[in-house]
């Protein structure tokens, strides 16, 4: 585990605060725990035997940032960048505090990106069936969603018994034209 976090520090430029990481893992009642770092908050899989970062060496590496709890500006939870026809790239996920401000935040977040990327950001929320260990991703995507996204979210919706990472996923937001 120590080697894993050293590697995470070298590759990702961050380092977990040991005390806060331990406290969050003990206090969290879900399948995941949030480990604080100087560069953000990372998702830890509580079902992992080695307690390594769930996405340290995986394609599913989601970096979380805390939003300011004292204002109504939510966090940007994800962007699928359209690089070429039929190809999308999942950049990152953030954590929302307020659903009502999502459209305006998308507009603000897109200032540094090409305007066409806004067409792939969404406001809708996918329902999470935590009790069964599934993620329901039936809502929110446009009708012409690529097969790549179908395969990607199919991996996220695996049952916990068949998923070696023990994934019980969290709230996730989908894509729709603003």
Curated annotation (Swiss-Prot):
Origin superkingdom: Eukaryota
Cellular location(s): Mitochondrion
GO cellular component: mitochondrion
Keyword field: Mitochondrion
UniProt protein name: Uncharacterized mitochondrial protein ORF6
Provenance organism: Paramecium tetraurelia
Higher taxonomy: Eukaryota, Sar, Alveolata, Ciliophora, Intramacronucleata
